[in-house]
A protein has these predicted regions:
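Helix-to-loop junctions at the C-terminal end of transmembrane segments
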Residues: 57-71, 157, 267-279, 364-365
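Symmetry-related core transmembrane helices of the 12-TM Major Facilitator Superfamily/SLC fold
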Residues: 165-182, 372-390
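Helix-loop boundary and gating motifs at the non-cytosolic
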Residues: 2-51, 217-224, 228-256
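Hydrophobic core of transmembrane alpha-helices in multi-pass small-molecule transporters
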Residues: 16, 98-115, 226, 306-320
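Intracellular juxtamembrane helix-capping segments at the cytosolic ends
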Residues: 113-128, 320-333
Length: 406
């Protein structure tokens, strides 16, 4: 196996494990929490608190990592895996204390989101050190890991109960921790790392105001992304309720998650070729339009067929957004700002989730499914308009409006 295949395989394995656990923790959050007696509103509150904490935590951690001290991308991922493992082990055995379940689940939900941008930053860090990683392929295989887990976990939970979810998470996180521990540069890559530390780079923009003043178009993309993921998280966090309203159950939940995740693989694997012709900024706008169509379909859905049609738009929405966002940051930002840039992308996803969590459960409990989906559609449409405005703004202060740089 050549070095390119070796590094890509290792990074793909980290992504597969991450998104398998993402399925059991995030995609199945409502299933697990409602099995412990939580209402829709309580689920929404818990996820909102976890998302708010994560949105605040991510840029802070990114700034620490960007300063290149003891805390590296790899070490933070290892710490995160350990925390999620311990928390999931606690959830497996705590069944009757809702306050404890609330706190522990919020922590592991928050930590898992917090290390997602660090996973992306790890790839681009290693690439700069000479580790030839095909990001799109590895990230797409992560989605395939989510898809395969979804296909089995829905039926398994229906048969064995929601207690299975934290048990599976414990196993996945144990494997992840071992894999991360051994996934590190050696030899030539370490020499490149040492050279990088002594070389000197552009000034890091630690303050939020300084950062977004330096990258005006990125600020608009972040705001647009919040709107996109308001709609996206509304569907994902309350998917079981949407599916039940359309006549399905946990098995259909698994199939639905499988469909949207497996469709991500070919797009992410081929995104490098697309980026030779289309700029990351334009792809971000395109993905926003796909998020809009995806939730719009659900307003008029009458059965599970339309749910699957809606989920198929993941091919153009999330599957395009994630790699396009990663490449946008990598190509337009100074090296010492890139972990923060990746963190702000994930923070936008998280903040969208916060507003969705705060409103969706309340709207669902008091007004019903369709008003919830109409709200998500309207917010997503605003995001599409903002993303178009971003194309007319410079990516860095003093530049012309966005133009892709190879």
């Amino acid at each position: 196996m050549n070095k390119k295949a070796l590094w890509t395989t290792g990074y793909a394995f980290l992504n597969i494990a991450y998104f398998a656990a993402f399925c059991t923790v995030h995609a199945c959050a409502a299933v697990f929490l409602m099995s412990r007696g939580f209402t829709n509103t309580q689920v929404g509150m818990l996820l909102a608190i976890a998302n708010i904490t994560s949105a605040l935590f991510q840029p802070f951690i990114a700034d620490v990592i960007d300063k290149k001290g003891w805390l590296t991308n790899r070490r933070f991922i290892l710490i995160s895996c350990t925390v999620i493992l311990i928390g999931s082990l606690m959830l497996r055995f705590i069944t009757d204390s809702k306050p404890v379940i609330f706190i522990v689940y919020a922590i592991i939900y928050m930590i898992q989101f917090a290390y997602q941008p660090v996973m992306t930053a790890l790839c681009f860090e290693y690439r700069k050190k000479g580790c030839d990683i095909v990001y799109g392929l590895a990230r797409g295989l992560g989605s395939a890991g989510f898809a395969v887990t979804s296909a089995f976990i829905g039926r398994a939970v229906e048969a064995k109960g929601a207690d299975l979810l934290p048990a599976v998470t414990v196993i996945i996180m144990a494997v992840s921790a071992v894999a991360v521990f051994f996934y590190r540069p050696s030899g030539k890559e370490k020499a490149a790392e040492a050279a990088e530390v002594t070389e000197g780079t552009e000034k890091s923009h630690g303050k939020v105001t300084d950062f977004f003043r330096e990258y005006p178009a990125f600020l608009l993309f972040v705001i647009a992304s919040i709107c996109f993921f308001f709609a996206h998280n509304m569907i994902n966090d309350f998917m079981i309720q949407i599916i039940r309203a359309l006549g399905g159950g946990e098995t259909e939940l698994g199939y639905s998650n499988f469909l949207q995740a497996i469709l991500e693989l070919p797009v992410m694997a081929l995104i490098g070729f697309v980026l030779r012709k289309v700029s990351p900024a334009k792809l971000l706008v395109f993905s926003g339009a796909a998020f809009f169509v995806k939730i719009l379909i659900l307003i008029f859905a009458q059965n599970m067929v339309w749910m699957f049609v809606s989920q198929s738009f993941q091919l153009f929405a999330y599957a395009v957004f994630i790699p396009a966002g990663a490449y946008y940051v990598s190509h337009t930002m100074a090296e010492n700002d890139q972990v923060k840039g990746q963190a702000y992308v994930t923070s936008a996803i998280t903040i969208g989730g916060v507003f969705s969590n705060l409103l969706s459960g309340i709207i669902l409990d008091n007004l019903g499914m369709r008003p919830m989906l109409i709200t998500g559609t309207a917010v997503c449409f605003v995001g599409v308009l903002i993303s178009f405005a971003a194309l007319r703004s410079p990516d860095r202060k003093g530049d012309q409006p966005y133009e892709y740089r190879s």
